């Protein structure tokens, strides 16, 4: 992965690198590979993730159909 440093602005380059790594899922991968995960634990984690995704999808569908109230959007920039 490569990030350009412009005008010796290393902070901005680091921020861009972190953003790229986050998008690629590198941090999550590092966290998962940080220690050995037993196959049974891996199956349980993946099953829980699938259930979470299905619930989220169902919730969004219910909101679109008007059966659940929409989540209020946060107000940005009001002081």
Swiss-Prot record:
Signal peptide range: none
UniProt KW Ribosomal protein keyword: yes
Organism phylogeny: Bacteria, Pseudomonadati, Pseudomonadota, Alphaproteobacteria, Hyphomicrobiales
Keyword annotations from UniProtKB, A to Z: Ribonucleoprotein, Ribosomal protein
Region (Disordered): 59-79
Gene3D superfamilies: Ribosomal protein S8 (1.20.5.1150)
Entry-linked NCBIfam families: S21p
InterPro entries from the UniProt entry: Ribosomal_bS21, Ribosomal_bS21_CS, Ribosomal_bS21_sf
Claim: Transcription regulation is one of the keywords in the record: no
Listed name of the protein: Small ribosomal subunit protein bS21
Record-linked Pfam families: Ribosomal_S21
Highest taxon of source: Bacteria
Similarity comment: Belongs to the bacterial ribosomal protein bS21 family.
GO molecular function terms listed in the Swiss-Prot or TrEMBL record: structural constituent of ribosome
GO cellular component: ribonucleoprotein complex; ribosome
GO annotation, biological process: translation
